[in-house]
């Protein structure tokens, strides 16, 4: 049986850093990964760019995490966003600040983050083994003594770190193994729920908006027709629904509301800088300005091209209809695309 001081299960970002830090303290460390290489999911996160951290203060971080955010105060007091940036700077990866307080590697390549973490672990003499799935713990007197791999090999250690991640992306190795392993040790597992995920909608017109990106817009999540939360930023339409930074942020909230059998809608404000009166005044000005020209021409000043056709169909506006023929009732509908 092979024996080390520390065994880390899972070679994602957390596992690589935990293994490297433990090794820096003089410990012999074995890092075990079931996939063919470390940090597969990290290499594709942020559309391949890797959103490393955010510039928000600690209170906003805690708030965004949800109901159990206070659990993170202790960890964040020891290692927070500035520490993260400094950590990667020391590893040779410079980061840049973008809209929304998001930090990305200057290269816009998540592989730079992955390679830096692997190098960090290896430079500190961490032994990494891949294609090795942990299937069981061996315990004596309520203490873990060793782990058993799927191939039958066993490894013992004084300390064990479970860093398997969640179950968000099975192809990358995130299949929920950690829940099963923790449960086998007697831990109670709270039912996981989706977070940071796209949303699926049955609205047929969304298919016409596939790949449309909207920036500097505001979305409102409506709970039983009442605003539950508002966010400013960007979204993207897909063939199945919605995605993008704002959608990923509110997805956990929406799932919780749906679990409570609430009625949930998303409202998108394309002109958040204008209140209803200002927007109404602008629409009237545009209609008057375009006069005998087709409504479609006027709409190009207000809406992305891809939205115009679905909008006209929804509001029964004919292609031949001219601006001067739009009555007040139809004009008011322009406020709620």
Explain the meaning of each model-derived region.
Residues 1-14:
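Beta1/beta-strand and adjacent pyrophosphate-binding region of the FAD-binding site
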Residues 7, 23-47:
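Glycine-rich FAD pyrophosphate-binding loop
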Residues 7-9, 32, 134, 147, ...:
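Short hydrophobic core segments
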Residues 36-38, 44, 59, 188-191, ...:
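An anion/pyrophosphate-binding glycine-rich loop and adjacent beta-alpha core
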Residues 49-97:
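Glycine-rich active-site loop/strand segments that organize a redox cofactor
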Residues 130-143:
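A conserved short coil-to-beta-strand element within the FAD-binding core of flavoproteins
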